[in-house]
A protein has these predicted regions:
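Flexible loop/hinge segments at secondary-structure junctions
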Residues: 1-140
């Protein structure tokens, strides 16, 4: 991602990941469709805005949905760029899809004050959300 893009990432409270220099105008032609994750959408809106400021004839359509839709739409050609807030699965990379990380975000797990849940590890939270542990007493 460009230096200018990383400034946008940082300004929107995401963690920068890479820097490849400044934006430059490429005089693009045609339309690009970007689709996927609602958690990526706010920063993508800013990136598109900055890109269009330099490439005034750029035609970019942004479609907000979810990570899986973004990945599937990229795979089937419905969109040009998919947005995902998760890593690609092996089955998705086997289709030839390639992930380019533009930022990192944080996820918080919040429980009610009356819930005795405390100090769970990432693996324990994963067990809860994947269904491996369906009851609190099953969390090990």
């Amino acid at each position: 991602m460009s230096e200018d893009g990383q400034k946008i990432i940082s300004a929107n409270k995401y963690i920068e990941v890479a820097n490849s220099g400044a934006f430059t105008s490429t005089n693009p032609k045609g339309k690009i469709v970007v689709a996927g994750s609602s958690s990526v959408t706010p920063v993508m809106e800013k990136l598109i805005e900055a890109y269009k400021a330099i490439n005034t004839n750029a035609d970019i359509e942004l479609q907000e949905s979810d990570s899986t839709t973004g990945i599937t739409s990229t795979s089937d050609g419905t969109c040009d760029i998919g947005m995902a807030s998760r890593e690609l699965k092996d089955t998705e990379t086997a289709l030839g899809l390639k992930a380019t990380v533009i930022a990192m975000d944080g996820i918080a797990v919040i429980v009610n004050n009356n819930n005795p849940a405390e100090d769970y590890t990432v693996d324990q939270v994963k067990d809860i959300f994947t269904g491996s542990a369906a009851k609190w007493e099953e969390v090990k």
